[in-house]
Regions:
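Alpha-helical sensor/transducer elements of the RecA-like P-loop NTPase core
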Residues: 2, 18-19, 44-48, 71-74, ...
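Pre-Walker A (Motif I) flank of P-loop NTPase domains
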Residues: 28-32
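C-terminal boundary/linker of central alpha/beta nucleotide-binding cores
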Residues: 33, 37-40, 46-50, 116, ...
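Conserved adenine-nucleotide phosphate-binding loops and their immediately adjacent elements
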Residues: 1-23, 89-95, 186, 191
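Conserved phosphate-binding/catalytic loops and adjacent sensor/switch elements of nucleotide-binding enzymes
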Residues: 40, 44-121, 128-132, 176
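Conserved nucleotide-binding/hydrolysis micro-motifs of P-loop NTPases
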Residues: 64-67, 130, 159-162, 182-183, ...
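Extended alpha-helical scaffolding segments used for macromolecular assembly and cargo binding
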Residues: 337, 345-366
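Hydrophobic "anchor" residues on beta-strands that sit immediately upstream
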Residues: 122-123, 267
Length: 366
């Protein structure tokens, strides 16, 4: 099955030695967590490191169908048997039994099998955000708690999994690579646009696109594809006008991000898109306590902002206290465009609420 095969590294992929070094250093930890929104090159980066590193590995690409624990463990064991064919043999028999034992027993047996492996190896769980089944999250948490020293786990995901990350962080057992780490630097953006995509942009043109996209790789790729085949004047005009309202960007963010959110989250995102900076009480004032489209009351603003950050929904914290946030520029532009398109009657009232909150709190707005 293709779920067990590592994606190939294309020749045009931009080398990222600063991140490759971090992966190698991370082998001393239990877990490397690569957590960032869609389009930040998570899978490509993990694949590039494994192709460059001299380390045995097992790869499992997850999807929504893997929320069935029996299916998940079947694929997990198949991946691990690429390291050692004896891993999980007895567990396979249990999975096929009419009344399989408790999942904790399965995981414990699997851990004991891994502990008998003579070589160190890496297990990669890619697209981990597809997993919502609590029993599977608990199984991975148990595996991490008792993880044999031979194994290092890499999880690539669009949002943080419900695992004991705080405990691992305090113990120095966790390496984290996040949106701020994965975004392209100016040098990487130049290499990507001019070498990988075959453009011939000036440093200032690359800088404009880098600033507009905030180093978001998918955004740079969408811009680069749109630039191909244009003359110099057309390129200059496109770069000057490029925003989250560009059709390619609209389509990508709508399909890959916005449509995947629950209705109350979408409503919160749209209503707060008029704000340059967000905090909990400001969001409460703007969103209001009236019920959303599904009849459910809106969630507390601070709790929602914290949830958006955990879910890597293009939210950028502006202070260490996590009081103020902003949306990624292109994402904010998409949300504003969607608000104008779907709820034009709301915009003026949302602005009035925002102005009132700022006046009450002695702050300027706009």
């Amino acid at each position: 099955t293709t779920k067990l095969y590592i994606p190939p590294v294309r020749p045009e992929v931009v080398p990222r030695p600063r991140l490759i070094e971090q992966f190698t250093a991370g082998l001393g930890h239990k877990l490397t967590l690569v957590s960032a929104p869609a389009g930040y090159g998570k899978t490509t980066l993990v694949s590039a490191w494994l192709h460059a590193a001299d380390v045995p590995f097992a790869w499992l690409s997850l999807d929504e169908g893997d929320n069935d624990p029996a299916r998940f463990f079947a694929y997990l064991i198949a991946a691990l048997q690429g390291i050692d064919v004896e891993i999980g043999r007895s567990v396979q028999g249990w999975l096929e039994a009419p009344h399989p034992p408790a999942i904790e027993s399965l995981v414990t047996t699997l851990i004991n099998d891994i502990a008998r492996v003579s070589t160190s190896f890496v297990l990669v769980l890619d697209d981990h955000h597809a997993i919502t089944e609590r029993a599977i999250h608990e199984s991975i948490g148990l595996l991490l708690d008792r993880q044999p020293s031979q194994m290092h786990l890499i999880i690539a995901t669009r949002h943080d999994p419900p695992l004991p990350l705080a405990r691992l962080r305090v113990r120095g057992e966790l390496l984290e690579l996040r949106q701020s780490d994965l975004r392209f630097t100016a040098e990487e953006a130049t290499a990507f646009l001019n070498r990988s995509l075959g453009l011939d942009l000036s440093a200032s043109e690359v800088a404009v696109l880098g600033e507009r996209t905030e180093g978001w790789i998918a955004g740079l790729q969408l811009a680069g594809l749109s630039l191909q085949g244009r003359d110099a004047a057309g390129m200059a005009r496109f770069i000057d006008e490029f925003s989250g309202r560009h059709q390619f960007v609209l389509d990508y963010l709508t399909d890959e991000v916005l449509k995947r959110q629950a209705e109350p989250v979408q409503e919160f995102l749209l209503r707060t898109s008029i704000l340059d900076r967000l905090c909990g009480s400001l969001c409460d004032a703007v969103v209001g306590q009236d019920a959303g489209p599904d009849g459910a009351p809106h969630q507390d603003g601070q709790a929602m902002l914290e949830e958006l950050q955990r879910a890597n929904l293009f939210v950028v914290p502006l202070d260490d206290e996590r009081e103020w946030y902003r949306y990624h520029h292109l994402f904010a532009q998409l949300l504003c465009a969607r608000l104008e398109e779907t709820r034009p009657d709301l915009t003026a009232d949302l602005h009035r609420r925002a102005v009132a909150w700022h006046e009450e709190n002695g702050l300027g707005f706009g």
